[in-house]
Amino acid sequence: MIGLNCLEPNQTQPVHAHAGADKFYFVLSGAGRFSVGDEEKTVEAGSVVIAPAGIAHGVTNTGAERLSLLIGIAPGIK
């Protein structure tokens, strides 16, 4: 599955996990902070974040503009 996620300033995608499915995020625009497992990562346009299957992950838009993320999940969620 491929999709586009957009978060407004200060909006958060709560921490969650996908059993049996890896997920990637490619930052198209904006800035944010990801948590993947026990790690935290600040991102900007061009950054890539990978959340392996079963690992909790979430993101917060820490910038002043919309955070746009191209996402991919494989295999897709059923």
Where do the PLM segments sit?
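A short glycine-rich, His/Asp/Glu-containing loop-to-beta-strand
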Residues: 1-15, 72, 77
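Histidine-centered catalytic micro-motifs
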Residues: 14-20, 55
